[in-house]
């Protein structure tokens, strides 16, 4: 990192920093500079990894096109391995989006409108108490009715 800077130059920078910032603020400044350098290194490494991944994907696409043009029968082992990797990647991408043909019973939506026809004809629905049958109750148990 400090290829062109020797020990004397680093010592001079340290002394100047001590004079300019003082002994109280110099450690804080050094920590903030090192954290900035770490953040820049992390960002550079992540960009590098993303570019390598994109180049690998482009190489797989190029290998696939090359294999299609040659025909899939006479391929080199490297090319066959690249095609297999590409097929596995395509299957792993498509796998989460597959739709099941038959939904499970617990996943079905309950539709009360379809059952209303069957409950109207059942005898238990006609034996339910109505407000007219409750009128004959004793009013002594209800203090508001006595008033």
From Swiss-Prot:
This is Sec-independent protein translocase protein TatB. Signal peptide: none annotated. Residues 85-97 have a biased composition (Polar residues). NCBIfam families: tatB. InterPro entries: TatA/B/E, TatB. The gene is tatB. The chain crosses the membrane at residues 2-22. It comes from Shewanella sp. (strain ANA-3). Residues 113-133 have a biased composition (Low complexity). It comes from the Bacteria. GO terms for molecular function: protein transmembrane transporter activity. Gene3D superfamilies: 1.20.5.3310. Pfam families: TatA_B_E. Residues 85-147 are annotated as: Disordered. It is a single-pass membrane protein.
